[in-house]
Amino acid sequence: MYWESAMKKSAAFTLIEILVTISIIALLTMIGVTNFRVANQKARDGRRQGDLEQIKAALELYRTDQGKYPIGASLPATIESATTVYMNEVPDDPVAAQTYYFSSDGETYTLCAGLELGTDIVNGCGSCGVTCNYKVTSPL
């Protein structure tokens, strides 16, 4: 008789065991979601930096052929001359609310982006939709 009642008690989980288990699962889930969010931000920042380097390469090719950079206060849809296409489609920021800032007087240019994980504010940039904190300029 005693043996049967002891078996019945140990066959179930106590309320404390269930609460501890749920708490551990919740904590691990929160850590996983936070790490996933940061990984996505890093990926978008890497894409922004890569995009600006690609635009820079196209602008340098344009200058080599044309003797100057394209003049303007915004990025054109394509970077091309009358005879050569240097970049078929200028990439957009991965976040729709943000843009890449571009300014050129023909002799120099400035490209800027707002990194999600960057904290330094860069001077000489216009509006990226957020605070610009990554800058690429023409070689001097």
List the predicted regions and their residue ranges.
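Aliphatic-rich helix starts adjacent to a transmembrane/signal segment
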Residues: 33-53
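Regular, well-ordered alpha-helical segments
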Residues: 30, 38-41, 57, 61-64
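N-terminal single-pass transmembrane signal-anchor helix
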Residues: 8-36
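Extracellular/periplasmic head regions of type IV pilus-like filament subunits
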Residues: 57-117
